[in-house]
Amino acid sequence: MTELQAKDPRTLHTSGAAPSPTHVGSPLLARLDPDPFQGSQHSDASSVVSPIPISLDRLLFSRSCQAQELPDEKTQNQQSLSDVEGAFSGVEASRRRSRNPRAPEKDSRLLDSVLDTLLAPSGPEQSQTSPPACEAITSWCLFGPELPEDPRSVPATKGLLSPLMSRPESKAGDSSGTGAGQKVLPKAVSPPRQLLLPTSGSAHWPGAGVKPSQQPATVEVEEDGGLETEGSAGPLLKSKPRALEGMCSGGGVTANAPGAAPGGVTLVPKEDSRFSAPRVSLEQDAPVAPGRSPLATTVVDFIHVPILPLNHALLAARTRQLLEGDSYDGGAAAQVPFAPPRGSPSAPSPPVPCGDFPDCTYPPEGDPKEDGFPVYGEFQPPGLKIKEEEEGTEAASRSPRPYLLAGASAATFPDFPLPPRPPRAPPSRPGEAAVAAPSAAVSPVSSSGSALECILYKAEGAPPTQGSFAPLPCKPPAASSCLLPRDSLPAAPTSSAAPAIYPPLGLNGLPQLGYQAAVLKDSLPQVYPPYLNYLRPDSEASQSPQYGFDSLPQKICLICGDEASGCHYGVLTCGSCKVFFKRAMEGQHNYLCAGRNDCIVDKIRRKNCPACRLRKCCQAGMVLGGRKFKKFNKVRVMRALDGVALPQSVAFPNESQTLGQRITFSPNQEIQLVPPLINLLMSIEPDVVYAGHDNTKPDTSSSLLTSLNQLGERQLLSVVKWSKSLPGFRNLHIDDQITLIQYSWMSLMVFGLGWRSYKHVSGQMLYFAPDLILNEQRMKELSFYSLCLTMWQIPQEFVKLQVTHEEFLCMKVLLLLNTIPLEGLRSQSQFEEMRSSYIRELIKAIGLRQKGVVPSSQRFYQLTKLLDSLHDLVKQLHLYCLNTFIQSRALAVEFPEMMSEVIAAQLPKILAGMVKPLLFHKK
């Protein structure tokens, strides 16, 4: 740090020579210490060595302590010598004391206080406070250990550590056997110092009584311009600091010997016998003197960390790093500012520049990785570019990422946990957001819902994502840019995404979508072109009804997509389609399609094919006599739901033939069209489920109950699959979906049993499955005959009411939605909208047969009464099922796994009245 230039290299300088007038100007050379070579001769006063003072002078030291004086010369000579003081510091201090004994003392005391503050370790050891600067007697020695005359007080080995971290000992008493000019070896140096190997080139002392030669030592000092021989015994350091270099390269474990090649932690003069002498063993078990830094005896003795040179630029840079800690979040420098980086410890490092912002913070680590990119700062080399298209998010997590600092090279930290990659810009091409959208698994609600939730999303890999990580719904900019294949409709996600009107279906005779086909496909749109304008953002999903149009921001004609003028003939249409439908129905026109009955009907091409336009009007639910019933509120509510119509791109089996036959009719004929949502319910009806019962063996109660439980398990899986395809059900929260299935699975099974018994055997027997049909005779032989009679009431009611298939489908959905928890559901508003929609669908299904308001109202009352009566009937089944489950071992009845979970978790709640049944009529 301090560059010394010899003005007269030919003048010899002995150990006792007086210091030059200009030599006291450098505050970093040493403190004022007693001279270990007091018996030596003094050289001429003409030998002058002028130092170049560094910039820390006048910055670190003030003049507040000039009045302090040492007690006496004897006390100074009796002061203990630190094992980390340099030899040159003692010589120079003795020369400086002869001229001005107070000024160097002032500098050394303040330097002692400043360095004690900077380099003191953090932790509980800091409770030992260092003496103030004005009271300190010894200072730091920056250049090397100070050698005493008596070889018995010299350590056995010369320490290889930088002496900056060692603190001098406190005053010691007079030592016997040593002169006034000799130093007493400190007692607080820890014993592990004795285990250090001697450096190369060291020569053992011949004996205790032998003293080192007092001849002037000639020291060769390496300067920038070459080698220069100086007569002074004080060592001259290279102008380029080396301590940080050793820190960056090796962490300070090994250092070069004095005679070795340069590049070590500390440079010492060459061919100096004082630095090649070994040291004898030190005294042990001595207490640490007050004010001594614990690093001198604890950290430095075991952890050989090289010490940074006291350079003002380096201190300024380190202080800037600590103050501006936000720019070092990714590396280890933010946590330990003086610790070496975690690069390759043996890699050589370049010389350290001494600017205000050094580039030596991290050593170079070879070529940067391809997946690395600068997290902070504006500097980004051409080789470190983010590959937005080719590189995936997993590539960066597999390899360590180089972090670039401003003005520094890349340093890799492979053993640090990598922070997440910063979010990229939104993709510019459509479909990228769906591909890049992350998926998060949803934890099960309770232990009872684990198996059911696993079945709900068995082959999908994970339940649908929710919250802020939900897949982005398709929101195309225009209606013509969103098309769907005719064989499937993607299911709506959970409540976090925009609801889809139609879920995955299996149409046109194709097999229904299984678990794999029901996976949400983000890259596909979710509705048909005529309904794109009805898509609402997530914030509006809970405010407006799903199947109504009263609160929609814009009213669109369901036939051609033009702006609707009102509800005409029961459907929200424009004036053009209203007039067209009126003329087509009142006039005697037989429209035929020139194509395949699949022409596009929109605002521009609505006049091209009147046959397809009329077909679409009829399919949407337009009825010529609908305007006659506007005075009746019920009919008006019923017709308002006709807005939700199946678009033209969906075709059912034999659709073209049936519609072609219905379109070529006379005005006197009556049109019977099934509402589109009911058609969807027909298409998602589960297949036939078999019980696997062996009818060749005699019936026993245990065998029949076991077969019924196995059938119930399969039907429960079928209910889960059916509910996933149910329009509007997937818009509910996943917890609500599981809760509704657990509360209603028994009602759905017994209701399906009544429908099969009504359709296949006219209600004369209980049609559990094609391989398990119980007649009255077989029922009487069973122990649960009374339970069979309870279940037999449902098909008998079907026979009495002559329930149609459309009515059954709507009532089945309402059974799924007829029981909720007392505290309500998470998506209660969506649930109420869905339930109201299917109630209106039931009204429309009733209107297919019952003509007139009064018959329709009576029919609605009868069917809803039947739904209310199922609550009490199913309660008996729940009680019997729970009792059988509790006594299953004694009764030798087997219960499948998922069914057991549902029974154990939910049936006690239901029987205890912890659920809320939704009734249509008050009791």
Curated annotation (Swiss-Prot):
Composed of three domains: a modulating N-terminal domain, a DNA-binding domain and a C-terminal ligand-binding domain. Interacts with SMARD1 and UNC45A. Interacts with CUEDC2; the interaction promotes ubiquitination, decreases sumoylation, and represses transcriptional activity. Interacts with PIAS3; the interaction promotes sumoylation of PR in a hormone-dependent manner, inhibits DNA-binding, and alters nuclear export. Interacts with SP1; the interaction requires ligand-induced phosphorylation on Ser-344. Interacts with PRMT2. Isoform A interacts with NCOR2. Isoform B (but not isoform A) interacts with NCOA2 and NCOA1. Isoform B (but not isoform A) interacts with KLF9. Interacts with GTF2B. The modification Phosphoserine is found at residues 20, 82, 130, 162, 190, 213, 293, 344, 399, 666. Residues 38-49 have a biased composition (Polar residues). Residues 165-304 are annotated as: Mediates transcriptional transrepression (in isoform A). It comes from Rattus norvegicus. Residues 677-923 are annotated as: AF2. Residues 557-629 bind DNA. Residues 1-49, 67-111, 152-239, 333-371, 412-435 are annotated as: Disordered. The steroid hormones and their receptors are involved in the regulation of eukaryotic gene expression and affect cellular proliferation and differentiation in target tissues. Depending on the isoform, progesterone receptor functions as a transcriptional activator or repressor. Phosphorylated on multiple serine sites. Several of these sites are hormone-dependent. Phosphorylation on Ser-293 is highly hormone-dependent and modulates ubiquitination and sumoylation on Lys-387. Phosphorylation on Ser-344 also requires induction by hormone. Basal phosphorylation on Ser-82, Ser-190 and Ser-399 is increased in response to progesterone and can be phosphorylated in vitro by the CDK2-A1 complex. Increased levels of phosphorylation on Ser-399 also in the presence of EGF, heregulin, IGF, PMA and FBS. There is a cross-link at residue 387 (Glycyl lysine isopeptide (Lys-Gly) (interchain with G-Cter in ubiquitin)). A zinc finger (NR C4-type) spans 557-577, 593-617. This is Progesterone receptor. Residues 1-164 are annotated as: AF3. Residues 669-903 form the NR LBD domain. Residues 450-536 are annotated as: AF1. There is a cross-link at residues 7, 387, 521 (Glycyl lysine isopeptide (Lys-Gly) (interchain with G-Cter in SUMO)). A motif (LXXL motif 1) lies at residues 56-60. InterPro entries: NHR-like_dom_sf, Nucl_hrmn_rcpt_lig-bd, Nuclear_hormone_rcpt_NR3, Nuclear_hrmn_rcpt, Progest_rcpt, Znf_hrmn_rcpt, Znf_NHR/GATA. Residues 1-556 are annotated as: Modulating, Pro-Rich. Belongs to the nuclear hormone receptor family. NR3 subfamily. A motif (Nuclear localization signal) lies at residues 184-188.
